[in-house]
């Protein structure tokens, strides 16, 4: 091989490697552009997935709260009616306490009273317990001095019965308390 041929061969090799370098630079630039687009697409997909999961959790919470509210409404549906009936029940008790009623009238009033009490019990309305004074269930309208026979915070007299619907207080019992 002559020097001329060798120079041409080297020149051809250099020319052959130059386009490869340019092509590889273009390929690398293309790959980084594709990688960048892919990364952005993955970030958007992750963002959408997070938004979907949050929306799904929010819908479940809304459904749970709606169910709880519906159950509460069903459980306490008779609250207003019970509050309206309680004064009538008090009046029946006062009427039964009146002296001079005939036995027939007294028996009729007792039957009406019992039927009202039974209807209220079926709806979950019960009298407030009267063992010891509880400020959550009783309203102290008067106090008396405590002694050996009557310890502090015991109930001396009930002026008006209290009622509760399940665990919700409808009306506190008005009581006289030893203090």
Curated annotation (Swiss-Prot):
Basic and acidic residues bias spans: 1-14
GO cellular component, one term: cytoplasm
GO molecular function terms noted in the UniProt entry: adenyl-nucleotide exchange factor activity; protein homodimerization activity; protein-folding chaperone binding; unfolded protein binding
Keywords: Chaperone, Cytoplasm, Stress response
Subcellular location: Cytoplasm
Listed Acidic residues bias regions: 15-32
Region (Disordered): 1-40
Superkingdom to which the source organism belongs: Bacteria
One GO process term, biological-process aspect: protein folding
Subunit structure: Homodimer.
Family designation: Belongs to the GrpE family.
Stated role: Participates actively in the response to hyperosmotic and heat shock by preventing the aggregation of stress-denatured proteins, in association with DnaK and GrpE. It is the nucleotide exchange factor for DnaK and may function as a thermosensor. Unfolded proteins bind initially to DnaJ; upon interaction with the DnaJ-bound protein, DnaK hydrolyzes its bound ATP, resulting in the formation of a stable complex. GrpE releases ADP from DnaK; ATP binding to DnaK triggers the release of the substrate protein, thus completing the reaction cycle.
Xref: PANTHER family: GRPE PROTEIN, GRPE PROTEIN HOMOLOG, MITOCHONDRIAL
UniProt protein name: Protein GrpE
């Amino acid at each position: 091989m002559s020097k001329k041929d060798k120079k041409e061969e080297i020149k051809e090799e250099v020319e052959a490697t130059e386009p490869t370098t340019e092509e590889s630079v273009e390929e690398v630039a293309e790959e980084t552009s594709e990688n960048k687009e892919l990364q952005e697409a993955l970030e958007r997909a992750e963002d959408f997935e997070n938004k979907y999961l949050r929306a799904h959790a929010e819908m479940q919470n809304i459904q749970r709260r709606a169910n709880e509210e519906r159950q509460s409404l069903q459980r306490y549906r008779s609250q207003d009616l019970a509050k309206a009936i309680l004064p009538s029940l008090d009046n029946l008790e006062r009427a039964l306490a009146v002296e001079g009623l005939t036995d027939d009238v007294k028996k009729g009033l007792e039957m009406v009273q019992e039927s009202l009490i039974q209807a209220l019990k079926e709806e979950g309305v019960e009298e407030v317990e009267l063992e010891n004074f509880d400020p959550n269930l009783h309203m102290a309208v008067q106090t008396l001095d405590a002694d050996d026979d009557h310890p502090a915070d015991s109930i001396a007299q009930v002026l008006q019965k209290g009622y509760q619907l399940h665990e919700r207080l409808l009306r506190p019992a008005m009581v006289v308390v030893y203090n």
